Amino acid sequence: MQSAHYTGRFAPSPSGPLHAGSLVAAMASYLDARAHQGRWLLRMEDVDEARTVQGAAQDIAASLSQLGMHWDGPVLVQSRRQQHYQRACAQLGERVYACGCTRKEIADSRLGMAADGAAIYPGTCRSGLAAGKRAHALRVRVPEPGQALEQIDFEDRWQGWQRQHLASAVGDFVLRRADGFWAYQLAVVVDDAEQGVTHIVRGADLLGSTARQIYLQSLLGYPTPTYLHLPLVTHADGEKLSKQNGAQALNLNRSLTLLHEAARFLGLEVARVDGVAAFWELAVLAWRRRYL
């Protein structure tokens, strides 16, 4: 019997096939949902259409199925939801403004880098575009230091207590990019709210984005989910394993071995079994014992 109080999701970017790092994230989100007797959704985060690889979404879904991870309901695809993001942006009203700054101009302000690697925005276009400047992107204002919602606090189930000052850590951030694509921060907030997501389990590379997402949730009147940010699977040099730096596609002929390796990374002891279904039964129990 599924719980009406838990909805989780796995939301990969279809820029390539599943690899060891994305398997860990998928497994953890799946186990947390099933251990809570909740729903587990699948979303394809292809809002950045320039990075989308043709056929990757279908490959990811097929791989999850072969590995025994079966989602509830239809797959949500971000690239089909442009009007939803437009409506949310319009709802923010005067908090949104056009920005004509180039990446170089922002970097030249030397305010440092946000946790996601983007340069901290100095607020150049807050009071309007300078003469001769053309709008490139849309940004949302963050509060000045000391104002309500400038400091975002939340408890992460894995990483513990978190605090971020939006003004100094990121500045006014992008909602629609210069290339016309909606930014991840807005799209993920809208999708989580409209899908009723209550619990988010994902990699720690997104921990630094969470305060911005909580801020947007507050502005839009959305509930804030519970967060768990996992340690990242890395190369030997410590760099995050990703499609962009050569992570190898999973060999699904080794499905059980792959599942056991991912479980060990998550600190789970799962006895050797003969089939995928039996693995998941034991893995759900192991997750429940350790993390609930």
UniProtKB/Swiss-Prot annotation:
Q: For binding Zn(2+), which residues are annotated in this chain's numbering?
A: 99, 101, 121, 125
Instruction: Report the GO molecular function annotations.
Output: ATP binding; glutamate-tRNA ligase activity; zinc ion binding
- Any one cellular-component term (Gene Ontology): cytosol
Residue positions annotated to bind L-glutamate are: 9-13, 45, 184, 202
Going by the UniProt record, its keywords in alphabetical order are: Aminoacyl-tRNA synthetase, ATP-binding, Ligase, Metal-binding, Nucleotide-binding, Zinc
Q: A Gene Ontology biological process annotation?
A: tRNA modification
Annotated motif 'KMSKS' region, positions: 240-244
Q: Where is this motif: 'HIGH' region?
A: 12-22
Cofactor descriptive note: Binds 1 zinc ion per subunit.
Cofactor(s) needed, names only, are: Zn(2+)
Q: What is its EC number?
A: 6.1.1.-
> Where on this chain does ATP bind?
243
Q: Pfam families given for it? A: tRNA-synt_1c
What role is this protein assigned? Catalyzes the tRNA-independent activation of glutamate in presence of ATP and the subsequent transfer of glutamate onto a tRNA(Asp). Glutamate is transferred on the 2-amino-5-(4,5-dihydroxy-2-cyclopenten-1-yl) moiety of the queuosine in the wobble position of the QUC anticodon.
Q: What family classification does the UniProt entry report for this protein?
A: Belongs to the class-I aminoacyl-tRNA synthetase family. GluQ subfamily.
Q: What protein name does the entry list?
A: Glutamyl-Q tRNA(Asp) synthetase
Native species of this protein?
A: Verminephrobacter eiseniae (strain EF01-2)
This chain is encoded by the gene named: gluQ
